[in-house]
Each structure stands twice: as structure tokens, then as C-alpha cells.
Amino acid sequence: MPAAYIKSVIKTVPDYPKPGILFRDVTSILEDHKAYTTSIELLVKEFAPYNFDKVAGTEARGFLFGAPLAIELGIGFIPVRKPNKLPRKVISESYDLEYGTDCLEIHEDAVKPGEKVLMLDDLLATGGTMIATANLIRRLGGIVEHAGFVISLPDLGGEAKLQEIGVQSHSICEFEGE
């Protein structure tokens, strides 16, 4: 099963970025051509039927999966960045992380009203990053109903939080209770 192979490639780093966190290092997928290409293929298979207008990938690991997915789907890619990284006029949204707080920005002209946008990131934990991303896209008039991830940590409740704001999530693999 392709998802099982991808999960087997993901390395776990204990106590990173702080004590008590088991960090799932999705960059280990990038080192394995088969795992990386299979990840993109699985995301394409899942999301191609929805006919999205754009993929929004969150900094920075969301870029690594979101941009190739957008290319395969034949649509545009929106980089969702941390503050002061985008050159044109932006809108901003603050959010809570599993291990702190942060802010995200997108160009104010990145989404046209009515465009269907797929949000994509490497990992779903508490959902804070994706909620902030959804808020940014919706403030610009975009439609956000789906989010994709390589990894989900269901014990942290992110999927339920996304459902509360009308976003369905799909992950390639899950790490429960680990």
C-alpha cells in the first residue's frame, strides 16, 4: 500500500522543537524519490475530481507538496508565508501553533472572489495554521472547503476544528497516540 510505504519513510525526531514533542519529519520523504512522487500522485488522485482553481500551500513545507500538486492539477499556486516575505501588498492573520503563536500572509490579489482553493500543508496538528489560511482566503472571497496533508496527528484535534469551519481534510497517513 503506497500510504504505508510513505509512513514508513517518515522519520520521528523526539523533543524537537521543544521537549515533549515528537516531530514527524516530512523532509525525509523528499530524500526518497519513490515516497515523494507517490505522495504527489496520491494527492492528485484525491483532489483532481474537485476542479480547484488554485492550491494554497503554507510555509514552508506546504510549498514542497503544494507546488508540485498545483503543477500536476494544471492550476496556480498561492504561497502562504510568514510576515515580511511577500513583496506586494498583503493581508495577515494570526494563529496558534502546537508549540507557540505566529502570523501568516498572502498577497491581497492572490485569490479572486469565487475561486475554489485547496489548502495544502505537510502536517495537520491542532489546525491553527489551516484555520488562519482559510480565513485569509475567505477574506479575499475565495471558497475553501478542502485541505490536504501528508501527515495527520488526529489526537491533537485539528480535523474536528477544520470541520467546524466547513473544511474537510484528507491526509495520506496518520500517527495516532504516538
From Swiss-Prot:
Entry-linked Gene3D superfamilies: 3.40.50.2020
GO MF terms, alphabetically ordered: adenine binding; adenine phosphoribosyltransferase activity; AMP binding
Class of this enzyme: transferase
Pfam family, one: Pribosyltran
GO terms (BP aspect): adenine salvage; AMP salvage; purine ribonucleoside salvage
InterPro entries recorded: Ade_phspho_trans, PRibTrfase_dom, PRTase-like, UPRTase/APRTase
S-S bridge residues: none
CDD domains: PRTases_typeI (cd06223)
Enzyme nomenclature, EC number: 2.4.2.7
Catalytic activity: AMP + diphosphate = 5-phospho-alpha-D-ribose 1-diphosphate + adenine
UniProt pathway: Purine metabolism; AMP biosynthesis via salvage pathway; AMP from adenine: step 1/1
Primary residence: cytoplasm
A cellular component term, taken from the record's GO annotations: cytoplasm
Ranges that cross the membrane: none
Annotated compartments: Cytoplasm
Alphabetic keyword roster: Cytoplasm, Glycosyltransferase, Purine salvage, Transferase
Subunit structure: Homodimer.
PANTHER family linked to this entry: ADENINE PHOSPHORIBOSYLTRANSFERASE (PTHR32315:SF3)
Family as reported in the entry's similarity comment: Belongs to the purine/pyrimidine phosphoribosyltransferase family.
Function: Catalyzes a salvage reaction resulting in the formation of AMP, that is energically less costly than de novo synthesis.
Name of protein: Adenine phosphoribosyltransferase
Lineage, highest ranks first: Bacteria, Pseudomonadati, Pseudomonadota, Gammaproteobacteria, Alteromonadales
